[in-house]
């Protein structure tokens, strides 16, 4: 089961107050519902591919309105051939839609979230939970990027949902997609805050555990890469220095060098793998700083270059 599916399953088991149940139902029906007429009666179908969400809708409807509700199961004939669950009812459908602030006067569909419906902070949380159950998805925290989004068919609803999330300082943003709109979060901290707001506390803990391990692993990898790069740089410089020193020895002999340069040249030949700092600590005449060692090695590089190009040699 995916992380998003586990999160939704957890949410469908939450107990809610009556006012919050209506807010959650409003989001679920508004985003997943469709209306039709049968025998001159208004019929409402709420469709989902998630069995737990279908049971949630069924239970909330029965608890809040005690109406006759059907639960149908169909199988998709294309692509994944998943089951499709349809929660269907016609009894008092218009009145329920009006109470849930989905239908207004004269059978007008309300595309914005009703302020009255989410007047209480607990109801705001519940509407957000219903919206996530209806159209939400969240990446597994083990994947390459953090991303949570909620899909809406209508721009007005998407904008009001984004504003609702931002009442909780979630820094959510909106984006138009091919067949609708999304409200999304990209920051890991904001995703965990959202999970907390909608009541997915177990999923929040799992998300944080995985994120901490992942971030720690990334930090270790960056450190290792940095150390590897520095090591490669050190090895590359050492090989160049040794090559130049050997060239000097072949052309004029190390004995021709001033004592200070000869001493460093011999140490570098003998200890090719050590750093400049370590090399400075090996000088018999006394410890030399890293910059001092670097200066002498650069001087040896210059002498080797002068020999290669036939220039006059400066040994001092």
Curated annotation (Swiss-Prot):
Q: Does the keyword tRNA-binding apply?
A: no
* UniProt keyword annotations, A-Z: Cell cycle, Cell division, DNA-binding
Keyword DNA-binding assigned to the entry: answer is yes
Q: Which HAMAP family match?
A: HTH_type_WhiA (MF_01420)
Q: Which NCBIfam families match?
A: DNA_bind_WhiA
The text of the family note is: Belongs to the WhiA family.
Q: What does this protein do?
A: Involved in cell division and chromosome segregation.
Q: What is this protein called?
A: Probable cell division protein WhiA
Name its species: Bacillus velezensis (strain DSM 23117 / BGSC 10A6 / LMG 26770 / FZB42) (Bacillus amyloliquefaciens subsp. plantarum)
Taxonomic placement: Bacteria, Bacillati, Bacillota, Bacilli, Bacillales
